[in-house]
């Protein structure tokens, strides 16, 4: 805790450091008065105050009554006593690093806390989120330098003897924020009982999300509704995506899913006593998307007028839908004196194609992409190949010289795919 005084037109900046980390900063004229500040820190060797002078003498910075005390700043901690809620944590002038929000259990036996980290944005690497169980063990951490930052992280945490779970957040400026949902239930989601006759239906879908609607069961449960949890479990892996929703809705969108993936979807209702009831399982598949990888490409035959291009079939996990075929792109290299516009051909049911009627001794760029009904995936890296020169035998193909009447020619295709077209 400390007081500071920053008065004058040419005031610059006051900084406070915990070790090498900035924990407080104030810039410019603050009025002819003493201001109070408190910051929660885990002390790293030294606390340093730095006053940076302005460009003139008409500005003074002073500090007074500095104290260091154990504990969390009173204005930087909050107790959450409801069994369901949402937090939208933003930076403000009163925000101090390492602020805490403690979820406390009131009357639910064998309580388990659900924490849904919905969205996080850190302006600096030193921002973070930490979650601790009732014994003080750190269950989860995310720091500002992690790949940002829409999260969909879903935690189930046992309360332990202290009957609380703590969220600790450090934000550094007003571009930083964090959004959470939380709820308390008895036991865990795996203990939910099937509620006969309760169904969910698929309303819409994208390549990464499913939109669901379910029957209103508010009158079915004697102890009322507190919140819903929607789970989408992949049919091909142990990955489960979960979302937390309020009791006044019968619609939800689950995002962060994989394209063209089958999921077992169910809705869990939690009543006022923390008991859970689940709907029948709905099987749903996300929409297709473009392939996420490019095939690896190589050339198997080169003559003076043709190139045979071959590629390894794209592995199934990168299809993101029904793979319709491959697209082969060819063009003269950028340093060609007579550049030719890029041409491409779609190839079906095969992994090779021969490109004919090329110019002898000409360098070409070739690459390949796979495609679904949603479009082309990424292209392979450029494969540079030069056709043979008449009178010289290529190292890995037979010589095939032809007379060319024009520099610009139409490319022809020969492959075992009869429906391919330029």
From Swiss-Prot:
Q: Which UniProt keywords apply?
A: Repeat, Secreted
Fibronectin type-III domain: which residues? 2-74, 196-286, 291-386
Q: Which SUPFAM superfamilies does this chain map to?
A: Concanavalin A-like lectins/glucanases, Fibronectin type III, Spermadhesin, CUB domain
Superkingdom of the source species: Eukaryota
Per UniProt, subcellular location reads as: Secreted
Assigned GO CC terms: extracellular region; membrane
Asked if the record carries the keyword Secreted, the reply is yes
Q: Is Kinase there in the keyword field?
A: no
> As annotated in Swiss-Prot or TrEMBL, what is the tissue specificity of this protein?
Component of the acid-insoluble and acid-soluble organic matrix of the aragonitic skeleton (at protein level).
Where would I find the MAM domain in this sequence? Answer: 1-75
Q: What is the name attached to this protein's record?
A: MAM and fibronectin type III domain-containing protein 1
Q: Which species is listed as the source? A: Acropora millepora (Staghorn coral)
